[in-house]
């Protein structure tokens, strides 16, 4: 590599894509050297001087390392939009999250955030429904939505799965979804499960007078099969499909977004596998950026963490991810490594809090997230002493209490399902 891309006097253009990285150089490598090599490898340069890289080409496409802070090991790089294929998340990641993670000159490297210029944002449609559209589908305008995951994760027959879903719907759940590792196994085939569970959702709607949504997992071994399963759901009358975003991949997600828009189905995004590369604060890619890419592509709702449940993620991090999902304009937050982003009118995603939640946590969830959240419970519903329907009822009762500013203990005096939930889960 023959060039120095460190350029602290550079002012990014409105058309530049900007990345923030955390960089820890290898022994014997300066912070500036690691930064310039990373910038070159993620754009136009190679490990040695190449005659095919003309001065004219370099001047037009070279990256600019315009911010360096060795104390916090933070670097920001501005890239010309001409380096990227418009409308392609995979190509962007191949550049700024590709070979650079294999370089020997860094011990650790983390891509914290990307600011996309308006010229690139225009090539993406964002969520088809998003938060406001999901509220229209479900018919709930003024409270958090309540959902559950059918448990156990796997092992139930299609008939048993539908029965569990029915009990959850009847007890008060707005949404019932498959777990991430349930797709099309021999004990619970995709098409039979979808047909039976969508039928019982209709039954629960008729009985309760509320809309009931089943989120069936269409994660599949090929894009063709994934889209076929989407069509099956549409033919069965579904309003939703669920997808495991990381195992499925970015190209498949962009393909799915187009097909789902054609069919008029909302997309629920499960983030399983993300922690393989997001959890280490010194290496990998941030969950905030994963959320940003999901909104860019156009998923309608996304798991973001809970703060109070079993999943990793402190309050500041989770709320930064929430803001990236819902705000029209995200302000920069250097402490959380968040870059400013004007979303250019793309719809907000509905944040989903899920993982290790019980009805007793609803006051805290409501205090943290407010009304614009989907509260999703697994064991916190199905492990209720009185069964799944009672677990769902306890969640709705705890939510009603929180909305009315009443303590759970007081509300439980006239609500036996909540009383039983307090007896099981409330910390003594």
From Swiss-Prot:
Family from the record: Belongs to the RuBisCO large chain family. Type III subfamily.
Please give the residue positions where the record annotates the modification N6-carboxylysine: 177
> In this UniProt entry, which cysteines form S-S bonds?
none
CDD domains linked to this entry: RuBisCO_large_III
Cofactor(s) named in the record: Mg(2+)
User: Which parts of the sequence are marked as the site Transition state stabilizer?
Assistant: 310
Please cite one Gene Ontology biological process associated with this protein.
AMP catabolic process
Q: Name one GO molecular function term.
A: oxidoreductase activity
Cofactor: how bound: Binds 1 Mg(2+) ion per subunit.
Keyword Electron transport listed? The answer is: no
Q: Which domain of life is it from?
A: Archaea
Please, what other remarks does the record include?
Because the Archaea possessing a type III RuBisCO are all anaerobic, it is most likely that only the carboxylase activity of RuBisCO, and not the competitive oxygenase activity (by which RuBP reacts with O(2) to form one molecule of 3-phosphoglycerate and one molecule of 2-phosphoglycolate), is biologically relevant in these strains.
Major enzyme class: lyase
- Please give one Pfam family short name: RuBisCO_large
Subunit structure as annotated in this protein's UniProt entry: Homodimer. In contrast to form I RuBisCO, the form III RuBisCO is composed solely of large subunits.
Q: What is this protein called?
A: Ribulose bisphosphate carboxylase
* Protein function: Catalyzes the addition of molecular CO(2) and H(2)O to ribulose 1,5-bisphosphate (RuBP), generating two molecules of 3-phosphoglycerate (3-PGA). Functions in an archaeal AMP degradation pathway, together with AMP phosphorylase and R15P isomerase.
By what means is the activity of this protein regulated? Reversibly inhibited by O(2).
The temperature profile of activity is: Active from 25 to 40 degrees Celsius.
Binding of Mg(2+): at which residues? 177, 179-180
Q: Which UniProt keywords apply?
A: Carbon dioxide fixation, Lyase, Magnesium, Metal-binding, Oxidoreductase
Q: State the active site.
A: 151 (proton acceptor), 270 (proton acceptor)
Binding, substrate = 153, 271, 303, 354-356, 376-379
């Amino acid at each position: 590599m023959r060039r120095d891309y460190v350029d602290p006097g550079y002012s990014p253009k409105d058309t530049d894509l900007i990345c923030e990285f955390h960089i820890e150089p290898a022994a014997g490598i300066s912070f500036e050297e690691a930064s310039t090599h990373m910038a070159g490898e993620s754009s136009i340069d190679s490990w040695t001087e190449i005659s095919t890289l003309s001065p004219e080409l370099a001047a037009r496409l070279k990256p600019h390392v315009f911010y360096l802070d060795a104390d916090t090991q933070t670097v920001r790089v501005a890239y010309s939009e001409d380096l990227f294929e418009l409308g392609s998340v995979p190509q962007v990641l191949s550049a700024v999250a590709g070979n650079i993670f294999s370089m020997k000159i860094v011990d650790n490297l983390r891509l914290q955030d990307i600011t996309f210029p308006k010229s690139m944002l225009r090539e993406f449609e964002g969520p088809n429904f998003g938060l406001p559209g999901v509220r229209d589908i479900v018919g709930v305008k003024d409270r958090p939505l309540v959902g559950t995951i059918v448990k156990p994760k796997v092992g139930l027959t299609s008939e048993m799965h539908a029965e569990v879903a029915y009990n959850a719907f009847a007890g008060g759940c707005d949404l019932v979804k498959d777990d991430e590792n349930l797709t099309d196994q021999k004990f619970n085939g995709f098409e039979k499960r979808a047909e039976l569970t969508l039928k019982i959702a209709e039954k629960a709607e008729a009985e309760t007078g509320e809309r009931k949504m089943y989120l069936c997992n269409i994660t599949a071994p090929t894009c063709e099969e994934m889209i076929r399963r989407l069509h099956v759901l549409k033919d069965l009358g579904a309003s939703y499909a669920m997808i495991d975003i990381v195992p499925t991949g970015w190209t498949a997600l962009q393909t799915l977004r187009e097909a789902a828009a054609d069919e008029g189905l909302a997309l629920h995004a499960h983030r399983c596998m993300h922690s393989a590369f997001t959890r280490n604060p010194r290496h990998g890619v941030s969950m905030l950026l994963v959320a940003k890419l999901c909104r860019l592509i156009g998923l309608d709702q996304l798991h973001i963490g809970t703060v109070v449940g079993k999943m990793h993620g402190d309050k500041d991090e989770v709320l930064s991810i929430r803001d990236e999902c819902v705000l029209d304009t995200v302000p920069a937050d250097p402490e959380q490594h968040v870059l400013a982003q004007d979303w250019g009118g793309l719809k907000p995603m509905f944040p989903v809090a899920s993982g290790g939640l019980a009805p007793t946590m609803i006051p805290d969830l409501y205090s943290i997230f407010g009304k614009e959240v989907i509260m999703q419970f697994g064991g916190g519903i199905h492990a209720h002493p009185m069964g799944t329907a009672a677990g769902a009822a306890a969640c709705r009762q705890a939510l009603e209490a929180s909305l009315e500013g009443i303590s759970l203990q007081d509300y439980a005096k006239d609500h036996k399902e909540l009383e039983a939930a307090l007896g099981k889960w409330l910390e003594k």
